[in-house]
Amino acid sequence: MFTGIITGVGRISAVQALGESTTHGKRLTIEAPVGYLDDVGLGDSIALNGACMTVTTFSVEKGEFTIDISAESLDKTSGLDNEGPVNLEKALRAHDRLGGHIVSGHVDGIGHVTRFEQVGESWDLRVMAPPALGKYLAY
């Protein structure tokens, strides 16, 4: 579980194919901020741009970790298939403060942005979600 609050910004520094086909997914290497991986272990969950991923290797010394992402997850997310910046959030622990919301980080469907407009110092964002997901949305 996650709060949905970004705790660091990393950088996807390498993208490798898993297998000979794009249907096998990809392995991403992520450079993390200094000290970010100090309490991370193999198999821990870290959300990348809000999507829950599993740490497959990590190096505190190098400040980087890898995740293997399936073709399905690549299809249902954005910003995870090319090198560049990525938002990071470590999974909650039982004793952590809930400073945001409780979210799973699991993708249940794809929405489409229908409006993105600045209103004063805020932004009005409207997303059209598949009807089957309506029962899970608060609005």
What do the predicted segments below correspond to?
Residues M1-Y139:
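Conserved loop->alpha-helix
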